[in-house]
Regions:
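Acidic (Asp/Glu-rich) sequence patches and key acidic residues
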Residues: 1-119, 125-127
Length: 127
């Protein structure tokens, strides 16, 4: 099966389907991040964030003791920042890897709608 990156919007946008595969992004994240750095845009993995309560629940479910561990707050990013990265990567040879272009296209579709509505977002990973 494998991990998959997916976009979580700050709030729902009526009529927008936010579903995407995201597995290719997950499989190729290191090379995509390297390409983003060379292109002078923010790496995709830096848009990852998770609600601290969800993170704590996951960690406890994996047998880890969270205790007084202070987890970082959930971060939302502007759609415009995400679009800059997605568009730069779409034009790069790194997008030619298996399925990456389709995942980037889905990101661009979702983030374009988010930008029009002024909605923040972040990536989460489905394991």
């Amino acid at each position: 099966m494998g991990a998959a990156y997916f976009i979580v919007l700050e709030r729902k946008i009526d009529g927008l389907d936010t579903s995407m595969d995201g597995k290719s992004l997950s499989r190729h994240i290191e090379s995509l991040d390297e390409a983003a750095r060379r292109l002078g845009v923010r790496p995709l993995s830096e848009f990852f964030s998770v609600d601290p309560k969800q993170a704590a629940d996951f960690m406890e479910g994996e047998g880890m003791h969270v205790g007084d561990l202070e987890l970082p707050p959930l971060q939302q990013f502007t759609a415009e920042d995400g679009l800059a990265t997605v568009r730069a990567l779409s034009a790069h040879s790194a997008a030619q890897a298996d399925g990456v272009a389709q995942d980037l296209s889905a990101c661009e579709r979702i983030l374009s709608a988010a930008a029009m509505d002024g909605v923040g977002w972040h990536f989460e990973v489905d394991l």
